[in-house]
């Protein structure tokens, strides 16, 4: 009688999404160091790239059919670093000078606090392998990139990082949106055969990337403002439509 001592090995592709998640976390870690060393613009570039890794890790996992609870939880840990800790450190480094230390620390803590609440809510609502066509509340990557877009915009126009009062109002607004019941459209599937809605969103994304490459810091903030504004208006006008399955899921 032969005993098979060989352990069943998982195929290498199983680790691909987790590697992308690790890159997301690593870029967030580097962004923290850049902010602390007075390089917030470079940190913002790293965070945008981290956001792309955050998009692709889940999509690749679903394409390969290897979505898992571990992957979802690991992704949340990476997002906590890149899109919760990083914006809090950015606010503390740039926008609370002159405030009492305790007050400045609390205000800086707000993105981390609301961001982690948002991530916890997402994990409760989302089932591995069964994605919805929307998210409830603004995602932490979009919220963080929005804050950095304000920094990019002002740095490109005036050479500074913007008015702290405006930045803190933006932080308050983004924090509310993260835990709000408003539905925001997810990143579209990379397919022109997944329904008309997905095709429109995919074309809009491609067009946005083209003009972003041309105008860079000038256009990122307006693009995000359009995305947030459109989703808020759409949810207010047609709240019941957001609960319907997407064409790609039917």
What residue spans do the PLM features occupy?
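"…together with the soluble PPM/PP2C metallo-phosphatase catalytic core" -> "…together
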Residues: 11-20, 27-34, 38-40, 45, ...
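Topogenic membrane-insertion module of multi-pass membrane proteins
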Residues: 1-55, 212, 223, 234-237, ...
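C-terminal membrane-associated helical module and adjoining short loops/tails
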Residues: 1-5, 132-250
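Multi-pass membrane catalytic core of lipid/isoprenoid biosynthesis enzymes
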Residues: 14-22, 63-122, 150
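C-terminal ends of transmembrane helices
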Residues: 59-68, 116-130, 179-188, 232-239
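Helix-coil boundary and interhelical linker segments in multi-pass alpha-helical membrane proteins
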Residues: 30-46, 85-108, 149-167, 213-218
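Active-site His/Glu-centered metal-binding helix of metallohydrolases
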Residues: 26, 52, 56, 60, ...
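Short hydrophobic alpha-helical membrane-embedded segments
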Residues: 18-25, 80-82, 194-205
């Amino acid at each position: 009688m032969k005993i098979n001592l060989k352990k069943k090995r998982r195929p290498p592709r199983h680790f691909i999404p987790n590697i992308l998640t690790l890159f997301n976390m690593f870029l967030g870690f580097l962004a923290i160091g850049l902010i602390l060393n007075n390089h917030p613009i470079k940190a913002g570039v790293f965070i945008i790239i981290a956001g792309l890794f955050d998009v692709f890790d889940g999509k690749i996992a679903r394409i390969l059919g290897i979505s898992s609870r571990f992957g979802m939880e690991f992704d949340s840990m990476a997002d906590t670093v890149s899109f919760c800790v990083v914006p809090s450190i950015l606010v503390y480094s740039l926008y609370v000078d002159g405030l009492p230390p305790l007050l400045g620390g609390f205000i800086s803590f707000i993105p981390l606090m609301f961001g982690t609440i948002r991530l916890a809510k997402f994990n409760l609502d989302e089932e591995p392998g069964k994605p919805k066509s929307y998210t409830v509340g603004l995602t932490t990557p979009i919220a963080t990139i929005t804050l950095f877009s304000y920094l990019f915009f002002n740095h490109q126009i005036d050479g500074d990082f913007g008015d702290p009062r405006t930045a803190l109002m933006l932080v308050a607004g983004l924090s509310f949106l993260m835990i709000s019941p408003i539905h925001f459209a997810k990143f579209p599937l990379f397919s022109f055969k997944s329904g008309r809605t997905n095709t429109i969103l995919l074309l809009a994304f491609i067009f946005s990337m083209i003009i972003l490459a041309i105008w860079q810091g000038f256009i990122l903030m307006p693009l995000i403002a359009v995305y947030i504004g459109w989703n808020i208006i759409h949810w207010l006008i047609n709240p019941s439509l957001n609960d319907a399955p997407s064409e790609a899921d039917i």
